[in-house]
Amino acid sequence: MHSPFLTPGSRSQLDNLALLQLRRDQTIPTILQLHDEKNGGYKEGKVTNTRFGSFPHITLCDQPWGSQIIASKVDTGSRGRTQKMKRKADELDSSTQAEDKPSPQTPVAASSGFLHLLYPTPELWTASLPHRTQVVYTPDYSYILHRLRARPGSTVIEAGAGSGSFTHASVRAVFNGYPSDDQPTKKRRLGKVCSFEFHAQRAEKVRVEVNQHGLDGLVEVTHRDVYEDGFLLGDPKTGKSPKANAIFLDLPAPWLALKHLVRNPPEGTESPLDPTSPVYICTFSPCLEQVQRTISTLRQLGWLGISMVEVNNRRIEVKRERVGLDLGNIRGTVVFPKSVDEAVERTRALEERAQLFRATQNQSDGDSTPAPKAENEAKGGQQESEVPVYKQGRVMTRSELDLKNHTSYLVFAILPREWTEEDEKRCREKWPSNRVQEPQGPQKSKKQLKRESREKRDLQRKEQSQPETESQKE
Protein backbone atom coordinates (compact mmCIF):
# COMPACT_ATOMS: atom_id res chain seq x y z
CA MET A 1 0.00 0.00 0.00
CA HIS A 2 1.41 3.35 -1.07
CA SER A 3 1.04 6.35 1.20
CA PRO A 4 -0.86 9.45 0.00
CA PHE A 5 1.68 11.53 1.94
CA LEU A 6 4.57 10.31 -0.23
CA THR A 7 3.05 9.25 -3.58
CA PRO A 8 -0.47 10.71 -3.75
CA GLY A 9 -1.05 10.15 -7.46
CA SER A 10 -3.28 12.39 -9.56
CA ARG A 11 -6.70 11.34 -8.19
CA SER A 12 -8.26 10.47 -4.86
CA GLN A 13 -8.73 6.79 -4.07
CA LEU A 14 -10.90 4.76 -1.74
CA ASP A 15 -9.59 3.84 1.73
CA ASN A 16 -7.02 6.65 1.55
CA LEU A 17 -6.71 9.83 3.54
CA ALA A 18 -7.97 13.06 1.98
CA LEU A 19 -8.16 16.62 3.31
CA LEU A 20 -11.34 18.66 2.86
CA GLN A 21 -10.46 22.36 2.88
CA LEU A 22 -13.42 24.54 3.84
CA ARG A 23 -11.50 27.75 4.45
CA ARG A 24 -7.91 28.84 4.59
CA ASP A 25 -7.66 27.98 8.28
CA GLN A 26 -10.15 25.09 8.43
CA THR A 27 -9.36 21.63 7.04
CA ILE A 28 -11.06 18.32 7.84
CA PRO A 29 -9.14 15.02 7.46
CA THR A 30 -11.18 11.96 6.49
CA ILE A 31 -10.75 8.44 5.13
CA LEU A 32 -12.65 8.08 1.85
CA GLN A 33 -15.15 5.20 2.09
CA LEU A 34 -18.42 4.40 0.38
CA HIS A 35 -19.96 2.91 3.55
CA ASP A 36 -19.49 3.95 7.16
CA GLU A 37 -19.69 0.95 9.47
CA LYS A 38 -19.93 3.01 12.67
CA ASN A 39 -22.41 5.71 11.61
CA GLY A 40 -24.67 4.15 9.02
CA GLY A 41 -28.11 5.28 7.89
CA TYR A 42 -27.45 7.62 4.98
CA LYS A 43 -28.79 6.46 1.63
CA GLU A 44 -25.84 8.18 -0.02
CA GLY A 45 -23.33 6.12 1.99
CA LYS A 46 -20.69 7.79 4.13
CA VAL A 47 -21.25 11.54 4.43
CA THR A 48 -19.15 14.34 5.90
CA ASN A 49 -21.32 17.15 7.30
CA THR A 50 -19.86 20.67 7.44
CA ARG A 51 -21.14 24.21 7.90
CA PHE A 52 -21.12 24.58 4.10
CA GLY A 53 -23.26 21.53 3.46
CA SER A 54 -23.11 17.74 3.30
CA PHE A 55 -20.59 15.93 1.12
CA PRO A 56 -21.13 12.22 0.35
CA HIS A 57 -17.87 10.37 -0.19
CA ILE A 58 -19.17 9.01 -3.48
CA THR A 59 -18.67 12.56 -4.83
CA LEU A 60 -15.13 12.76 -3.41
CA CYS A 61 -13.71 9.49 -4.74
CA ASP A 62 -11.80 9.33 -8.03
CA GLN A 63 -11.56 13.11 -8.31
CA PRO A 64 -8.46 15.09 -9.35
CA TRP A 65 -6.64 16.62 -6.41
CA GLY A 66 -7.50 20.28 -5.97
CA SER A 67 -11.02 19.91 -7.40
CA GLN A 68 -13.87 22.05 -6.15
CA ILE A 69 -16.64 19.76 -4.89
CA ILE A 70 -20.21 21.07 -4.65
CA ALA A 71 -22.32 20.12 -1.63
CA SER A 72 -25.17 17.64 -2.05
CA LYS A 73 -28.71 17.33 -0.73
CA VAL A 74 -28.71 14.64 1.94
CA ASP A 75 -31.68 13.38 3.93
CA THR A 76 -30.18 13.86 7.40
CA GLY A 77 -33.35 12.53 9.06
CA SER A 78 -32.86 9.06 7.60
CA ARG A 79 -30.25 8.27 10.26
CA GLY A 80 -32.86 8.54 13.02
CA ARG A 81 -35.39 6.27 11.40
CA THR A 82 -35.15 2.79 12.83
CA GLN A 83 -35.78 -0.14 10.58
CA LYS A 84 -38.75 -2.38 11.27
CA MET A 85 -37.79 -5.27 13.49
CA LYS A 86 -40.83 -7.42 12.59
CA ARG A 87 -41.24 -8.83 9.12
CA LYS A 88 -44.07 -10.59 7.45
CA ALA A 89 -44.07 -14.34 6.74
CA ASP A 90 -43.51 -13.88 3.00
CA GLU A 91 -40.49 -11.65 3.71
CA LEU A 92 -39.03 -14.28 6.02
CA ASP A 93 -39.39 -16.93 3.33
CA SER A 94 -37.76 -14.77 0.69
CA SER A 95 -34.75 -13.85 2.84
CA THR A 96 -32.83 -17.04 2.23
CA GLN A 97 -29.87 -15.38 0.55
CA ALA A 98 -27.33 -13.20 2.32
CA GLU A 99 -28.09 -9.52 2.10
CA ASP A 100 -25.40 -7.45 0.49
CA LYS A 101 -24.68 -3.84 1.29
CA PRO A 102 -26.94 -1.52 -0.69
CA SER A 103 -25.26 0.65 -3.28
CA PRO A 104 -25.13 4.34 -2.35
CA GLN A 105 -27.81 6.55 -3.82
CA THR A 106 -26.71 9.10 -6.41
CA PRO A 107 -26.63 12.48 -4.62
CA VAL A 108 -28.21 15.68 -5.93
CA ALA A 109 -26.21 18.91 -5.98
CA ALA A 110 -27.15 21.62 -3.49
CA SER A 111 -26.48 25.36 -3.37
CA SER A 112 -25.23 25.51 0.22
CA GLY A 113 -21.50 25.67 -0.56
CA PHE A 114 -18.40 23.83 -1.73
CA LEU A 115 -14.98 22.63 -0.60
CA HIS A 116 -11.61 21.80 -2.15
CA LEU A 117 -10.23 18.25 -2.18
CA LEU A 118 -6.51 18.21 -1.25
CA TYR A 119 -4.02 15.38 -0.90
CA PRO A 120 -2.34 15.18 2.52
CA THR A 121 1.02 16.78 3.23
CA PRO A 122 2.82 17.11 6.57
CA GLU A 123 2.06 20.85 6.60
CA LEU A 124 -1.68 20.38 6.06
CA TRP A 125 -1.80 17.41 8.42
CA THR A 126 -0.18 19.50 11.17
CA ALA A 127 -2.88 22.15 10.77
CA SER A 128 -5.78 19.64 10.81
CA LEU A 129 -4.72 16.71 13.02
CA PRO A 130 -6.51 15.91 16.30
CA HIS A 131 -4.46 17.45 19.10
CA ARG A 132 -3.52 14.96 21.80
CA THR A 133 -0.42 16.77 23.08
CA GLN A 134 1.70 19.78 22.21
CA VAL A 135 2.21 19.88 18.43
CA VAL A 136 5.52 20.60 16.68
CA TYR A 137 4.48 23.07 13.98
CA THR A 138 5.95 23.58 10.52
CA PRO A 139 8.37 26.45 11.37
CA ASP A 140 9.92 24.31 14.09
CA TYR A 141 10.21 20.89 12.42
CA SER A 142 11.44 22.33 9.11
CA TYR A 143 14.42 23.92 10.87
CA ILE A 144 14.95 20.85 13.06
CA LEU A 145 15.11 18.46 10.09
CA HIS A 146 17.53 20.81 8.34
CA ARG A 147 19.90 20.88 11.32
CA LEU A 148 19.60 17.11 11.80
CA ARG A 149 20.76 16.54 8.19
CA ALA A 150 17.70 14.36 7.55
CA ARG A 151 17.92 13.12 3.96
CA PRO A 152 16.67 10.12 1.93
CA GLY A 153 17.98 6.94 3.48
CA SER A 154 18.54 8.30 7.00
CA THR A 155 17.18 6.72 10.16
CA VAL A 156 15.55 9.04 12.70
CA ILE A 157 14.81 8.29 16.36
CA GLU A 158 11.86 10.23 17.75
CA ALA A 159 11.15 10.12 21.48
CA GLY A 160 7.73 11.56 22.33
CA ALA A 161 5.47 10.92 19.33
CA GLY A 162 2.51 12.82 20.79
CA SER A 163 0.11 13.80 18.01
CA GLY A 164 2.34 12.54 15.18
CA SER A 165 3.14 15.89 13.55
CA PHE A 166 6.93 15.45 13.55
CA THR A 167 6.52 11.77 12.63
CA HIS A 168 4.88 12.57 9.29
CA ALA A 169 7.34 15.36 8.51
CA SER A 170 10.41 13.23 9.25
CA VAL A 171 9.21 10.21 7.26
CA ARG A 172 8.82 12.42 4.20
CA ALA A 173 12.35 13.76 4.68
CA VAL A 174 13.98 10.29 4.91
CA PHE A 175 11.77 8.47 2.37
CA ASN A 176 13.87 6.57 -0.18
CA GLY A 177 11.44 3.93 -1.44
CA TYR A 178 8.95 1.45 -0.02
CA PRO A 179 10.17 -1.76 1.65
CA SER A 180 9.38 -4.97 -0.23
CA ASP A 181 9.88 -8.71 0.23
CA ASP A 182 11.73 -9.04 -3.09
CA GLN A 183 15.50 -9.11 -3.12
CA PRO A 184 16.77 -5.66 -4.17
CA THR A 185 18.91 -5.52 -7.29
CA LYS A 186 21.31 -3.01 -5.73
CA LYS A 187 22.16 -2.09 -2.18
CA ARG A 188 20.07 0.88 -1.13
CA ARG A 189 19.33 2.12 2.35
CA LEU A 190 15.65 2.91 2.89
CA GLY A 191 14.73 5.70 5.26
CA LYS A 192 12.97 4.87 8.51
CA VAL A 193 11.53 6.63 11.57
CA CYS A 194 11.66 4.86 14.95
CA SER A 195 9.10 6.55 17.19
CA PHE A 196 8.90 5.94 20.95
CA GLU A 197 5.99 6.99 23.18
CA PHE A 198 5.54 6.52 26.93
CA HIS A 199 1.73 6.90 26.99
CA ALA A 200 0.05 3.66 25.89
CA GLN A 201 -3.12 5.21 24.42
CA ARG A 202 -1.23 7.84 22.44
CA ALA A 203 1.16 5.20 21.12
CA GLU A 204 -1.78 3.06 19.96
CA LYS A 205 -3.45 6.03 18.23
CA VAL A 206 -0.24 6.92 16.42
CA ARG A 207 0.13 3.28 15.35
CA VAL A 208 -3.43 3.29 13.94
CA GLU A 209 -2.78 6.53 12.04
CA VAL A 210 0.44 5.13 10.59
CA ASN A 211 -1.48 2.09 9.34
CA GLN A 212 -4.29 4.19 7.84
CA HIS A 213 -1.84 6.51 6.10
CA GLY A 214 0.12 3.69 4.46
CA LEU A 215 3.35 4.27 6.40
CA ASP A 216 3.83 0.70 7.66
CA GLY A 217 7.44 -0.35 7.22
CA LEU A 218 8.60 3.27 7.17
CA VAL A 219 7.52 4.17 10.72
CA GLU A 220 7.87 1.82 13.69
CA VAL A 221 5.99 2.92 16.82
CA THR A 222 7.11 1.49 20.18
CA HIS A 223 5.47 1.94 23.58
CA ARG A 224 8.38 2.35 26.00
CA ASP A 225 9.93 4.43 28.75
CA VAL A 226 13.15 5.53 27.07
CA TYR A 227 14.56 6.85 30.36
CA GLU A 228 14.97 3.29 31.64
CA ASP A 229 14.80 0.97 28.61
CA GLY A 230 16.68 2.89 25.90
CA PHE A 231 16.10 2.97 22.16
CA LEU A 232 16.65 -0.59 20.89
CA LEU A 233 13.95 -2.12 18.69
CA GLY A 234 12.16 -5.09 20.21
CA ASP A 235 13.51 -6.27 23.55
CA PRO A 236 15.16 -3.43 25.53
CA LYS A 237 18.19 -5.59 26.41
CA THR A 238 18.69 -7.88 23.41
CA GLY A 239 16.85 -5.91 20.74
CA LYS A 240 18.06 -4.76 17.35
CA SER A 241 19.85 -1.46 16.91
CA PRO A 242 18.09 1.06 14.62
CA LYS A 243 21.50 2.51 13.61
CA ALA A 244 20.16 6.05 13.78
CA ASN A 245 21.78 9.08 12.13
CA ALA A 246 19.45 11.71 13.65
CA ILE A 247 17.71 11.96 17.03
CA PHE A 248 14.85 14.20 18.17
CA LEU A 249 13.92 14.21 21.87
CA ASP A 250 10.62 15.86 22.79
CA LEU A 251 10.76 14.84 26.45
CA PRO A 252 10.28 16.59 29.81
CA ALA A 253 13.77 15.50 30.96
CA PRO A 254 15.89 14.69 27.88
CA TRP A 255 19.11 14.49 29.90
CA LEU A 256 17.87 11.26 31.50
CA ALA A 257 17.70 9.54 28.10
CA LEU A 258 21.14 10.66 26.88
CA LYS A 259 22.91 7.85 28.78
CA HIS A 260 21.55 5.38 26.21
CA LEU A 261 22.76 7.45 23.22
CA VAL A 262 26.47 6.60 23.38
CA ARG A 263 28.83 4.62 21.18
CA ASN A 264 29.70 2.02 23.82
CA PRO A 265 26.89 1.48 26.37
CA PRO A 266 28.18 0.47 29.83
CA GLU A 267 25.81 -2.50 30.12
CA GLY A 268 27.41 -4.16 27.11
CA THR A 269 24.30 -3.85 24.96
CA GLU A 270 24.33 -2.74 21.35
CA SER A 271 24.40 0.98 20.65
CA PRO A 272 21.34 2.46 18.87
CA LEU A 273 23.61 4.81 16.89
CA ASP A 274 25.08 4.29 13.44
CA PRO A 275 28.78 3.40 13.89
CA THR A 276 29.76 4.52 10.37
CA SER A 277 28.57 8.15 10.46
CA PRO A 278 28.29 11.12 12.83
CA VAL A 279 25.01 11.46 14.74
CA TYR A 280 23.01 14.70 15.06
CA ILE A 281 20.67 15.34 17.99
CA CYS A 282 18.01 17.93 18.85
CA THR A 283 16.10 18.39 22.11
CA PHE A 284 12.85 20.36 22.43
CA SER A 285 12.59 22.07 25.83
CA PRO A 286 10.34 24.95 26.98
CA CYS A 287 12.48 26.03 30.00
CA LEU A 288 16.05 27.27 30.29
CA GLU A 289 16.66 25.07 33.33
CA GLN A 290 16.00 22.03 31.14
CA VAL A 291 18.40 23.40 28.54
CA GLN A 292 21.18 23.87 31.10
CA ARG A 293 20.93 20.33 32.43
CA THR A 294 20.77 18.90 28.90
CA ILE A 295 23.87 20.80 27.75
CA SER A 296 25.79 19.74 30.86
CA THR A 297 25.00 16.07 30.20
CA LEU A 298 25.87 16.39 26.51
CA ARG A 299 29.31 17.74 27.37
CA GLN A 300 29.96 14.91 29.82
CA LEU A 301 29.08 12.30 27.17
CA GLY A 302 31.38 13.76 24.49
CA TRP A 303 28.93 15.59 22.23
CA LEU A 304 30.42 18.48 20.24
CA GLY A 305 29.14 21.60 18.47
CA ILE A 306 26.50 22.28 21.12
CA SER A 307 24.23 25.26 20.37
CA MET A 308 20.81 26.55 21.39
CA VAL A 309 18.28 28.14 19.01
CA GLU A 310 14.86 29.71 19.51
CA VAL A 311 12.64 29.82 16.41
CA ASN A 312 10.43 32.94 16.26
CA ASN A 313 8.57 32.66 12.98
CA ARG A 314 6.23 35.47 11.95
CA ARG A 315 4.44 35.80 8.63
CA ILE A 316 4.46 39.32 7.14
CA GLU A 317 1.77 40.56 4.77
CA VAL A 318 3.04 43.13 2.24
CA LYS A 319 0.67 45.34 0.25
CA ARG A 320 0.44 48.82 -1.27
CA GLU A 321 -1.85 51.39 0.33
CA ARG A 322 -3.14 54.04 -2.08
CA VAL A 323 -4.35 57.29 -0.54
CA GLY A 324 -5.84 60.24 -2.39
CA LEU A 325 -8.99 62.07 -3.45
CA ASP A 326 -8.45 61.38 -7.15
CA LEU A 327 -8.78 57.58 -6.80
CA GLY A 328 -12.57 57.54 -6.56
CA ASN A 329 -14.33 54.43 -5.29
CA ILE A 330 -11.59 51.96 -6.19
CA ARG A 331 -11.46 48.91 -3.94
CA GLY A 332 -8.65 48.87 -1.41
CA THR A 333 -8.01 52.63 -1.45
CA VAL A 334 -8.33 55.33 1.21
CA VAL A 335 -10.27 58.35 -0.12
CA PHE A 336 -8.52 60.97 1.97
CA PRO A 337 -6.15 63.86 1.13
CA LYS A 338 -2.66 62.49 0.83
CA SER A 339 -1.03 65.89 1.43
CA VAL A 340 -1.81 69.44 2.60
CA ASP A 341 -1.64 70.80 -0.96
CA GLU A 342 -4.27 68.32 -2.15
CA ALA A 343 -6.54 69.24 0.77
CA VAL A 344 -6.19 72.99 0.06
CA GLU A 345 -6.83 72.46 -3.65
CA ARG A 346 -9.93 70.42 -2.87
CA THR A 347 -11.22 73.14 -0.52
CA ARG A 348 -10.70 75.85 -3.14
CA ALA A 349 -12.59 73.84 -5.74
CA LEU A 350 -15.53 73.40 -3.38
CA GLU A 351 -15.57 77.13 -2.55
CA GLU A 352 -15.59 78.05 -6.23
CA ARG A 353 -18.53 75.74 -6.83
CA ALA A 354 -20.38 77.28 -3.88
CA GLN A 355 -19.78 80.83 -5.13
CA LEU A 356 -20.96 79.88 -8.60
CA PHE A 357 -24.12 78.30 -7.16
CA ARG A 358 -24.91 81.39 -5.07
CA ALA A 359 -24.34 83.67 -8.05
CA THR A 360 -26.79 81.75 -10.17
CA GLN A 361 -29.40 81.84 -7.40
CA ASN A 362 -29.27 85.67 -7.31
CA GLN A 363 -30.04 85.95 -11.02
CA SER A 364 -33.77 86.28 -11.49
CA ASP A 365 -33.78 85.24 -15.14
CA GLY A 366 -31.61 82.17 -14.69
CA ASP A 367 -33.59 79.01 -15.43
CA SER A 368 -30.87 76.46 -14.78
CA THR A 369 -27.39 76.17 -13.42
CA PRO A 370 -24.80 76.95 -16.10
CA ALA A 371 -22.14 74.46 -16.94
CA PRO A 372 -18.85 74.82 -15.05
CA LYS A 373 -15.90 76.40 -16.74
CA ALA A 374 -13.12 74.42 -18.29
CA GLU A 375 -10.68 75.52 -15.60
CA ASN A 376 -12.96 74.23 -12.86
CA GLU A 377 -13.43 70.95 -14.72
CA ALA A 378 -9.72 70.50 -14.94
CA LYS A 379 -9.33 71.15 -11.23
CA GLY A 380 -12.31 69.13 -10.00
CA GLY A 381 -12.02 66.22 -12.44
CA GLN A 382 -9.83 63.17 -11.99
CA GLN A 383 -6.46 63.17 -13.71
CA GLU A 384 -4.97 59.95 -14.95
CA SER A 385 -1.58 59.19 -13.45
CA GLU A 386 1.36 58.05 -15.55
CA VAL A 387 2.52 55.70 -12.76
CA PRO A 388 1.24 52.10 -13.17
CA VAL A 389 -1.41 50.93 -10.73
CA TYR A 390 0.81 48.27 -9.15
CA LYS A 391 3.39 50.97 -8.27
CA GLN A 392 1.02 53.52 -6.84
CA GLY A 393 0.78 54.13 -3.11
CA ARG A 394 3.04 53.27 -0.21
CA VAL A 395 4.33 49.81 0.64
CA MET A 396 2.71 48.69 3.91
CA THR A 397 3.61 45.63 6.00
CA ARG A 398 1.57 43.89 8.68
CA SER A 399 2.78 40.97 10.74
CA GLU A 400 0.71 37.89 11.50
CA LEU A 401 -1.15 38.04 14.79
CA ASP A 402 -1.54 34.31 15.51
CA LEU A 403 1.80 32.47 15.51
CA LYS A 404 1.62 28.73 14.85
CA ASN A 405 4.65 27.73 16.89
CA HIS A 406 5.74 27.37 20.50
CA THR A 407 8.15 29.31 22.65
CA SER A 408 10.65 26.50 23.10
CA TYR A 409 14.40 26.16 22.99
CA LEU A 410 16.12 23.80 20.57
CA VAL A 411 19.47 22.33 21.61
CA PHE A 412 21.61 20.84 18.83
CA ALA A 413 24.78 18.76 19.13
CA ILE A 414 26.94 16.37 17.10
CA LEU A 415 28.53 13.09 18.16
CA PRO A 416 31.49 12.33 15.86
CA ARG A 417 32.20 8.92 14.51
CA GLU A 418 34.41 6.77 16.73
CA TRP A 419 37.96 6.78 15.29
CA THR A 420 40.77 4.54 16.51
CA GLU A 421 44.44 4.16 15.62
CA GLU A 422 43.61 1.04 13.62
CA ASP A 423 41.17 3.06 11.50
CA GLU A 424 43.80 5.74 10.93
CA LYS A 425 46.41 3.17 9.91
CA ARG A 426 44.01 1.38 7.57
CA CYS A 427 43.07 4.63 5.84
CA ARG A 428 46.72 5.65 5.40
CA GLU A 429 47.48 2.32 3.79
CA LYS A 430 44.48 2.62 1.49
CA TRP A 431 45.06 6.27 0.55
CA PRO A 432 48.80 7.01 0.97
CA SER A 433 50.07 10.58 0.81
CA ASN A 434 53.55 11.81 -0.10
CA ARG A 435 53.15 14.94 1.99
CA VAL A 436 52.81 13.03 5.23
CA GLN A 437 56.21 12.20 6.72
CA GLU A 438 56.34 9.41 9.22
CA PRO A 439 58.29 10.38 12.37
CA GLN A 440 61.52 8.40 12.77
CA GLY A 441 62.66 7.54 16.26
CA PRO A 442 61.35 8.97 19.51
CA GLN A 443 60.03 12.51 19.47
CA LYS A 444 62.25 15.25 20.95
CA SER A 445 61.13 17.84 23.45
CA LYS A 446 61.35 21.60 22.89
CA LYS A 447 64.30 21.97 25.28
CA GLN A 448 66.26 19.30 23.45
CA LEU A 449 65.56 20.90 20.09
CA LYS A 450 66.70 24.31 21.40
CA ARG A 451 69.90 22.77 22.82
CA GLU A 452 70.72 21.08 19.51
CA SER A 453 70.13 24.28 17.54
CA ARG A 454 72.38 26.25 19.95
CA GLU A 455 75.16 23.69 19.64
CA LYS A 456 74.85 23.82 15.86
CA ARG A 457 75.23 27.62 15.85
CA ASP A 458 78.30 27.45 18.12
CA LEU A 459 79.91 24.92 15.80
CA GLN A 460 79.34 27.16 12.78
CA ARG A 461 80.95 30.12 14.58
CA LYS A 462 84.04 28.08 15.42
CA GLU A 463 84.45 26.99 11.80
CA GLN A 464 84.23 30.61 10.65
CA SER A 465 86.81 31.80 13.20
CA GLN A 466 89.49 29.18 12.27
CA PRO A 467 90.30 30.56 8.75
CA GLU A 468 90.80 34.04 10.24
CA THR A 469 93.44 32.85 12.75
CA GLU A 470 95.38 30.94 10.06
CA SER A 471 95.56 34.01 7.82
CA GLN A 472 96.92 36.13 10.69
CA LYS A 473 99.70 33.61 11.36
CA GLU A 474 100.87 33.74 7.75
Curated annotation (Swiss-Prot):
Binding-site positions, S-adenosyl-L-methionine: 163-165, 197, 202, 225-226, 250
GO CC annotations on file: nucleus; tRNA (m1A) methyltransferase complex
Keywords (A to Z) from UniProt: Methyltransferase, Nucleus, S-adenosyl-L-methionine, Transferase, tRNA processing
Subcellular location: Nucleus
Listed Basic and acidic residues bias regions: 423-432, 450-474
GO biological process: tRNA methylation
Principal subcellular localization: nucleus
EC number(s) from the headed UniProt entry: 2.1.1.220
One Pfam family named in its UniProt record: GCD14
UniProt-annotated stretches for the region Disordered: 75-109, 356-390, 423-474
Gene3D superfamilies tied to this protein: 3.10.330.20, Vaccinia Virus protein VP39
UniProt biased composition (Polar residues): 358-367, 434-443
Protein origin, superkingdom: Eukaryota
Sequence similarity: Belongs to the class I-like SAM-binding methyltransferase superfamily. TRM61 family.
Subunit record text: Heterotetramer; composed of two copies of TRM6 and two copies of TRM61.
Protein name: tRNA (adenine(58)-N(1))-methyltransferase catalytic subunit trm61
Organism: Aspergillus oryzae (strain ATCC 42149 / RIB 40) (Yellow koji mold)
UniProt gene name: trm61
